[in-house]
């Protein structure tokens, strides 16, 4: 359970509250490259869940190991058939962070922010693209959301053209 929630969250940048609504039947037949349309709870806007190879592998492994029923929530509570709550995911992520001695305040929203940070710093994805992905009103909102540091600005100013 832990791995699938991490892999889907870190690879899609969706809000955890939207991921928690997923049922096994929503994803069990999806292949890499396929998408599923979701409606964001916060904004009411449509967005997509992308199945990349890592997400597909995590889903496949989870389904083989846990053998959930198609009508169950993908992220089910251990106390019945209800979906996990955002509070439960927050607690889970805080436990993960503590287990590896991370001292900052991590929670459910960390997966969404980390997606953007990695896309920007490792893959060079621009704020315009990330703003579209996040359904933000502008790249400026995304820049504030991801937190541009003065060190990054100074580093940019040191680039010689």
Q: Locations of the language-model features?
A:
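Conserved catalytic core of the tyrosine transesterase superfamily
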Residues: 1-161
């Amino acid at each position: 359970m832990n791995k699938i929630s991490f892999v889907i969250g870190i690879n899609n940048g969706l809000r955890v509250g939207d991921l928690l609504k997923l049922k096994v039947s929503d994803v069990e037949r999806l292949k890499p490259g396929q998408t599923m349309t979701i409606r964001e709870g916060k904004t009411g806007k449509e967005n997509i869940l992308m199945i990349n190879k890592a997400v597909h592998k995590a889903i496949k492994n989870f389904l083989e190991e846990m053998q959930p029923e198609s009508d169950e929530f993908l992220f089910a509570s251990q106390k019945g058939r209800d979906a996990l709550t955002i509070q439960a995911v927050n607690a889970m992520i805080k436990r993960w962070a503590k287990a590896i001695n991370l001292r900052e305040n991590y929670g459910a929203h960390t997966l969404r922010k980390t997606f953007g940070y990695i896309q920007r710093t490792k893959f060079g994805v621009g704020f315009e693209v990330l703003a579209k992905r996040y359904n933000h009103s502008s790249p400026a909102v995304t820049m504030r959301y991801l937190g541009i540091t003065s060190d990054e600005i100074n580093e940019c100013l040191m680039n010689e053209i």
